[in-house]
Amino acid sequence: MKYFCDLHIHSKYSRGTSKNITIENLSKYAKIKGLHILGTGDFTHPEWFSQLKEKLEEKEEKGVYYLKKQDTQNKLLNYCDTQTTEEETRETGFIFQTEISLMYSDAVKSRKIHIVILSPNIPVTEEINKYFSSKGRMDY
């Protein structure tokens, strides 16, 4: 099976993003756009990570998380059409993902390197967050 994924997104806690971003809305619009799996975005942000842990659960696929409540997925089906295909009834998967920015200055100007980090599960994500929290602020 082919998967269409977007593994580099941001949460509502990032600069320049919609304040309407929720995990439910991400799932809804991923389905409309034909995406199977999304990155969670910004798992290093404490409030967002707390919401992710509350609302997502790992199922049979290791490392892929889904909304705990099937009701949210079913509401979208009513939005689409009364005759739905198997593709329309599938759940949106999520992989824990964040981006970090490494900044430095050379003799001429400042530079940034952006790194996307994917994490296989909640315990590893918690370890990553613990490490980064020892290096600086995590709430922005």
Language-model-derived ranges and their functions:
Residues 1-22, 131-140:
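Domain-core and long-helix interface of multi-subunit machines
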Residues 2, 50-140:
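Extended substrate/RNA-proximal surfaces in nucleic-acid metabolism proteins
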Residues 6-7, 38-42, 95-97:
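Active-site neighborhood of phospho(di)ester-bond hydrolases with catalytic His/Asp-centered motifs
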Residues 10, 44, 99-101:
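Catalytic metal-binding/acid-base residues of hydrolase active sites
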Residues 15-18, 49-53:
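Histidine/acidic-residue-rich catalytic or RNA/ligand-binding cores of hydrolases
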Residues 25:
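Short Gly/charged-rich anion-binding patches and loops
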Residues 28-49:
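Divalent metal-dependent hydrolysis catalytic cores, especially in the metallo-beta-lactamase
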